[in-house]
């Protein structure tokens, strides 16, 4: 069933009054069948042929006949049933009648329904059918939107009838929805049409649902680019058809989806603009673990580049990683040595087998067995000075170490000595352990010795070749380089503009150069065995305790000075005791 708008409403013309002929002379075959059920051809039953949709078409035809006639329009018997169709030859096939409108329906919605129903027939079928004249389009009963000719086509029993009423469709036209509703409210409602003589009977379903036929026609017209409705051909612009098709496809609901489930997704101009089209995606967005999938199995045409494998996990135990690559002697190294300096191959992850080939160092088994195992020469490893305490015990045996001494006493010891004379003493600063006093350019200089990560040097961050595990090794190396004319260290001058002072160590000042007294040797031994804070608790007279608490390096002048001072103190004490008695 198709209602087509065949042209614009022409200008109203004055028609002279004529004698009113009979209804059969004024009505076209379509309207005659709608009013008189006997006009059907013999052997054609409306109930068996057209099904439930015939009632809707008959109602629309009767509503068109029930509208009030406009000026210059012929009427049937002076009533309100216009039929401006001129007498035309009968169609090649007999047209079935249309049923009368049912009671309770609003005839104001007929114009919107007629606008929607204009797309039910294809363009090829519309050229063969007879259309109404232009006078019918000027009738106010059409709502100003143009009328149409009712064509009934025999349906097939494949698909069910229309799942939704015609009144629920979106009204189409040149105006928006709000403007059309306001225009309908302003127009007076026409009188209800009289009931028709025909009643719809149940029959087989039509061929194709209403939504499918509409979408098929609109898809064809929108792709072909139909002309506008103002050119006299009765066709609306393709933009309006596309909008109406989008509205109808959205209102199809689940019934249309179930019918089109077996069809392949077809992309049309209407669907691409208003409705989504489902494609089978190449990438579903699912993440896959790289350990479970080998990237070498991907094809060359894959849009995604191969992803590199994740870095291998290291074992928590460092000894487990290097036990198979390093000799046993390195594992028994002292605590001060750093194991991070040795390159380690990445071990495989313990949780999963190797899914990717890893680069491993090439090892020749024959060369390992043929060559004897070489001992790694670690510069930080010394078996005789593996701890700080051992290095201090080694330092006490050296004569150039003078123990606790301040810088004034050190200058007194180095006074008059040649350049290159030096001694090592305990630092008076509690932040440092040892200090170096040396003679250079006729002046005595003092500098602190740094202890950095188990090594000794004159700088806070010495170079690798300057690091020494013990003080004895450091002094011996400095003496060797000083004799060769190579100076390892230089001191910045306190006077701006002067060059730095080279540290030259050539002549150690030993504390064993002078013969020591028995008193000093006893004090030296006691200081080696007893802590300095426990000296006052020793069972000794107070003069001996005061002597032991003093510096324990040997100085003959100090011995003479102390002996004279002690003699004076003893004489004073005796003089004080005699008057008191």
Swiss-Prot record:
<dbReference type="GO" id="GO:0043161">
    <property type="term" value="P:proteasome-mediated ubiquitin-dependent protein catabolic process"/>
</dbReference>
<feature type="domain" description="SOCS box">
    <location>
        <begin position="504"/>
        <end position="554"/>
    </location>
</feature>
<dbReference type="GO" id="GO:0035591">
    <property type="term" value="F:signaling adaptor activity"/>
</dbReference>
<dbReference type="GO" id="GO:0005829">
    <property type="term" value="C:cytosol"/>
</dbReference>
<dbReference type="GO" id="GO:0005737">
    <property type="term" value="C:cytoplasm"/>
</dbReference>
<feature type="region of interest" description="Disordered">
    <location>
        <begin position="123"/>
        <end position="272"/>
    </location>
</feature>
<feature type="region of interest" description="Disordered">
    <location>
        <begin position="297"/>
        <end position="316"/>
    </location>
</feature>
<dbReference type="GO" id="GO:0005886">
    <property type="term" value="C:plasma membrane"/>
</dbReference>
<keyword id="KW-0341">Growth regulation</keyword>
<dbReference type="GO" id="GO:0005634">
    <property type="term" value="C:nucleus"/>
</dbReference>
<dbReference type="InterPro" id="IPR001496">
    <property type="entry name" value="SOCS_box"/>
</dbReference>
<keyword id="KW-0833">Ubl conjugation pathway</keyword>
<dbReference type="GO" id="GO:0017124">
    <property type="term" value="F:SH3 domain binding"/>
</dbReference>
<keyword id="KW-0727">SH2 domain</keyword>
<dbReference type="GO" id="GO:0016567">
    <property type="term" value="P:protein ubiquitination"/>
</dbReference>
<feature type="compositionally biased region" description="Pro residues">
    <location>
        <begin position="154"/>
        <end position="164"/>
    </location>
</feature>
<keyword id="KW-0963">Cytoplasm</keyword>
<dbReference type="GO" id="GO:0021819">
    <property type="term" value="P:layer formation in cerebral cortex"/>
</dbReference>
<dbReference type="InterPro" id="IPR035866">
    <property type="entry name" value="SOCS7_SH2"/>
</dbReference>
<keyword id="KW-1003">Cell membrane</keyword>
<dbReference type="InterPro" id="IPR000980">
    <property type="entry name" value="SH2"/>
</dbReference>
<dbReference type="InterPro" id="IPR036860">
    <property type="entry name" value="SH2_dom_sf"/>
</dbReference>
<dbReference type="Pfam" id="PF00017">
    <property type="entry name" value="SH2"/>
</dbReference>
<feature type="region of interest" description="Disordered">
    <location>
        <begin position="89"/>
        <end position="109"/>
    </location>
</feature>
<dbReference type="Pfam" id="PF07525">
    <property type="entry name" value="SOCS_box"/>
</dbReference>
<feature type="compositionally biased region" description="Pro residues">
    <location>
        <begin position="187"/>
        <end position="198"/>
    </location>
</feature>
<dbReference type="GO" id="GO:0035556">
    <property type="term" value="P:intracellular signal transduction"/>
</dbReference>
<dbReference type="InterPro" id="IPR036036">
    <property type="entry name" value="SOCS_box-like_dom_sf"/>
</dbReference>
<dbReference type="GO" id="GO:1990756">
    <property type="term" value="F:ubiquitin-like ligase-substrate adaptor activity"/>
</dbReference>
<feature type="compositionally biased region" description="Pro residues">
    <location>
        <begin position="89"/>
        <end position="99"/>
    </location>
</feature>
<keyword id="KW-0539">Nucleus</keyword>
<protein>
    <recommendedName>
        <fullName>Suppressor of cytokine signaling 7</fullName>
    </recommendedName>
</protein>
<keyword id="KW-0734">Signal transduction inhibitor</keyword>
<feature type="domain" description="SH2">
    <location>
        <begin position="400"/>
        <end position="509"/>
    </location>
</feature>
<comment type="function">
    <text>Substrate-recognition component of a cullin-5-RING E3 ubiquitin-protein ligase complex (ECS complex, also named CRL5 complex), which mediates the ubiquitination and subsequent proteasomal degradation of target proteins, such as DAB1 and IRS1. Specifically recognizes and binds phosphorylated proteins via its SH2 domain, promoting their ubiquitination.</text>
</comment>
<feature type="region of interest" description="Mediates interaction with SORBS3">
    <location>
        <begin position="124"/>
        <end position="494"/>
    </location>
</feature>
<dbReference type="GO" id="GO:0140031">
    <property type="term" value="F:phosphorylation-dependent protein binding"/>
</dbReference>
<comment type="subunit">
    <text>Substrate-recognition component of the ECS(SOCS7) complex, composed of SOCS7, CUL5, ELOB, ELOC and RNF7/RBX2. Interacts, via the third proline-rich region, with the second SH3 domain of the adapter protein NCK1. Also interacts with GRB2, INSR, PLCG1, SORBS3/vinexin, and phosphorylated STAT3 and STAT5. Interacts with SEPT6. Interacts with phosphorylated IRS4 and PIK3R1.</text>
</comment>
<dbReference type="GO" id="GO:0031466">
    <property type="term" value="C:Cul5-RING ubiquitin ligase complex"/>
</dbReference>
<feature type="region of interest" description="Disordered">
    <location>
        <begin position="1"/>
        <end position="23"/>
    </location>
</feature>
<dbReference type="GO" id="GO:2001222">
    <property type="term" value="P:regulation of neuron migration"/>
</dbReference>
<feature type="compositionally biased region" description="Pro residues">
    <location>
        <begin position="303"/>
        <end position="313"/>
    </location>
</feature>
